[in-house]
Every structure is written in structure tokens, then in C-alpha cells.
Amino acid sequence: MYHFETLIAKSIFRGGGQFDHHQNHYQYFCIAAKRQKGISMNFMNNYNNTNPIIIGIDHGYGNIKTAHCCFKTGVAAYDKEPTFKSNLLVYEGRYYLIGEEHKEFISDKMTDSDYYILTLAAVARELNIRKLTSARVHLAAGLPLTWVSEQKDSFKEYLLQNDSADFAFKGVDYHVEFAGADIFPQGFSAVADKLREFKGTNMLCDIGNGTMNVMYINECRPLAKKCFTEKYGTNQCMLAVRENLMKQFGVSVDETVLERVIRHGTADISQRYLTAIRDTATEYAEGIFRRLREHEYDPELMRLYVVGGGSCILKNFGSYDKDRVVINDDICATAKGYELLAEQKQNRKGGIV
């Protein structure tokens, strides 16, 4: 717990855990204000020749998100060049199709090389947006709230296992030098630039593909001792939908159809299938609130802030007081938050070298 509190303190607080409204908070919102123009600060100026580009990456179980893009968390490896080359990454003599074969949930993201390969793909996408093929990069990433203390050092080592990487993605050659990495708490990072809105008692709920992370933020201060992680992400909702469709109709529906209904509330399918999917998603949304109540959520006493890719489920199928619940359905919000925290840390240190 100490490491987690220290991480929060380094990101947001100064001096005995007290919030510095005159310096850190102001500096933070200067960074955030510049971001409101639609792109990150380092996207606009790339700093200079000595400072690396900060790239925030949200390593989700369902999707990899950066500040500007999102793609499926899936890797299919080949020893020989595959027939279909869409989203093909070539690294150290092997071929990887990015976005293929949905990756199963694992609590330790460092058990294989998949997330490293996905990191390279994410970096390539961000560099492509900047029209760069060679760069020094500082990674800003994160882990679930209750895992960050124990895993952040090993995850940082995992991401920085090589000083540099030469690879090709979608037919373009890239050379990347890794200048460093910062690991922040998931969920919290998505709202770090909005802490001044968290007056009174607040509950933050980050719904991802594999996990649901819950955190209390009271009077603009995150409470390290009131953080919870549950294996109740959108993947559990998808599994429940599949099981219900098989039980009712004996059919297996393509995942893209299910995702469209969950994300948008509807799809071009018959009404009976649509109703079955909606009913199951509604039950899942009720399950989210049930679990929140187990962590003492009371809508009359606190506000609820929902972030993450699964926030669309509550938005489309949940029953709640819209005056007491704020839903941020920007799937890239956490990755943007990682960059903000890393930029703030850089400014405090006078620059990353």
C-alpha cells in the first residue's frame, strides 16, 4: 500500500499529502487546457531534440488505447509471413498480426511477450500520426488500482526490456529508443485533471474488459485504502450474453454484433435477438451497481464517476440518476491521463533527459 500512496503523492500531492492548489493543481490544468485543443502538448511540438515524446498506452484486456487511437488486444504470431498482412508487425524475424485472436484475461500481463508487441504497435500508431519513423519515446502506462503497488516495478522493467527496438508495422520501418517509463493507477488517471470537481464524497468506477476498479475520492483526494479491483469487466457481460443466446435460441452470434449492441444499444438484427442481448446487458448493469453497493455506494450520499470502455453498458442499459452519476465514455481517457501525469512529472523535474 505504501508504494501506491507514494505513487499518488508523486502524481498529485505535495507535503504530507496536502493538495497544493497554487502550484501543482494550477500547473496540471495548464497542461489540461492545452490538451483541450484536441491533441497532446508533445504531439504539437515534440518538445525538442533532447526530450523524448511521451506516449500514453492503456494496456487493456480488450483493447489497447493511446491518446489518439484504439485497437483490439490480440496477437497472432507466425514464423513465416502470413497471407493476410493487415496490421502486420515484423520484429526480430517473427511476424505478428495485431488485433487477431482475442487475448484471454490474465492478472499478470508480463507472462508472455504479447503486451510488449502490442506496445510496439501502439507506439508505431502514435508515431505515424506525427509522421515520424524514428524517435526517443517515454512510455506512460498503468495497472489496476490494487495491483499497481506490487507490479509497477516489474511492469516498467517489462516495457523497458530493450533500450531500443527496430521493427516494421503496416509496411513502415520504425526505430524507437526508449528513454524511460512511468506506471500510474488505472481509472484514477482518467480523471486526474478533473480533481477539482470531486468535492465531498465520490466513488470512481473504471470498467474495463477484464476488471472493474473502484476508488473513493473525497474532497479532491484519492483514498489509497479504499481501492478495490474485481474481475467483473465487459468480458463477463459478453460471456453472459453468449450463454443466454445459446440457451434461448441455440445460436452463436458473432462478437462484432454483440459489441455493437453493447456499445450503441442496437444493431441490425432481428428484434428477438436484440431483446435477449439487451436484457442480459441490463442484468449486467444491475450487477455493477450491486457490487458498488457492496463497497458502500449510496447515490444519496455520494456522486459516482464512471470511466473505461465498459461505461457504455451503464450508459445504455443502466438505471441511475443522471444528476448523481457522471459517465465519461471516452475510451482513450485513461491513456490521455497517463500522458498528463507524465507531462506534469516531467515539468516538475525540469524535463526528462
Give a label for each model feature.
Residues Y2-L204, R221-Q236, Q248, T256-V353:
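Nucleotide/phosphate-binding catalytic cleft detector across ATP-hydrolyzing
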Residues T66, V214-Y216:
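Conserved blade-register residue in beta-propeller folds
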Residues I207-N213:
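Ser/Thr-glycine-rich phosphate-binding loops at phosphate-binding pockets of nucleotides
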Residues R242-Q248:
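Acidic, metal/cofactor-coordinating or nucleic-acid-engaging core segments within structured domains
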